């Protein structure tokens, strides 16, 4: 029987991640990254059956040319595999309130994604370019949109409405939306399996920690609160994003220090977070190296990162009422035993006790419980957003 394969596309502003995923197993048959769009050294790297390959895309390549390369060069060299692709699944960062679940893409869906572009100006326009490129290259395959925000549409209004004049929400949609929903969905499901509990009876707090980072309270398989807001800027300290700050800082920077609003936006999104505090790097590995060497900026950045994360985790016990586990995922969450241990030590009041050997073992793609047997459970689960996108794509096309 042929496999149920899906080509998954994740279009950034100047890059395109892609994978051919088996929707039944989550295994990637092909995976790769095209990057540096718009520059002379645009390149594409991919892996088939563990074999890594790389090629130049040519000067000033963009999404359409990258998709054409995937079709005409990579997939053309794997005709049996290409023939099993049943759909193209697209990761879409922001679906606003228009999209509460994954959908098959048609003209109305494209219009809806366009309408949400103001909420994700760096991401949604790039997703639309990727969708149109995929439609041109795969005119006979169904295209599916999977939204990062959809999982969080189950939040109650007390969690997503800001304490601003209500008409700003009613008339302009200004509210908390949250991100990383596909990742939080996947790891919360996997956590229930590891706990040997029905998903509907499982309460977990998921920490997706990468250059972007967010925490979500998941009650019975549904998001009930999350740290990112209208945009990905709110919440935790991140690689280059400031997370939560006093909003009046913006007024102070503009009116007292002479910043423009564009400069403030750039400062808070690209110059803050771990990079801004440490004055060293946004890469957590570099921060940990600096911490080990006694670098004051790196040490402070690490301490603030862990402290803010622990406070969020503690606060999310409120909407859950009962906590079954804390789940770490994402590049930092999956690989930094140091950060996991620091965060859980700050949460000792909740009876977290780290098992050092288990914690060190749960790295580099290995999942596992990292706490002692008599402790509240904390675990590491590598995320697999592409698998969720592939699963949703197959489910949707089978309903048609």
Curated annotation (Swiss-Prot):
Biological processes annotated in GO: acetate metabolic process; acetyl-CoA biosynthetic process
Function text: Catalyzes the formation of acetyl phosphate from acetate and ATP. Can also catalyze the reverse reaction.
Cofactor binding remark: Mg(2+). Can also accept Mn(2+).
One GO term describing the cellular component: cytosol
UniProt-recorded Gene Ontology molecular function terms: acetate kinase activity; ATP binding; magnesium ion binding
Record bears the keyword Manganese: no
Protein name, as recorded: Acetate kinase
Residues holding substrate: 91
Pfam families on file: Acetate_kinase
Active site residues per record: 148 (proton donor/acceptor)
Catalysed reaction equations from the record: acetate + ATP = acetyl phosphate + ADP
Pathway listed: Metabolic intermediate biosynthesis; acetyl-CoA biosynthesis; acetyl-CoA from acetate: step 1/2
Organism: Shewanella sp. (strain W3-18-1)
Subunit structure: Homodimer.
Family from the record: Belongs to the acetokinase family.
Keywords: ATP-binding, Cytoplasm, Kinase, Magnesium, Metal-binding, Nucleotide-binding, Transferase
Alphabetized InterPro entries for the sequence: Ac/propionate_kinase, Aliphatic_acid_kin_short-chain, Aliphatic_acid_kinase_CS, ATPase_NBD
Residues binding ATP, per UniProt: 17, 208-212, 283-285, 331-335
Site (Transition state stabilizer): 180, 241
Enzyme Commission number: 2.7.2.1
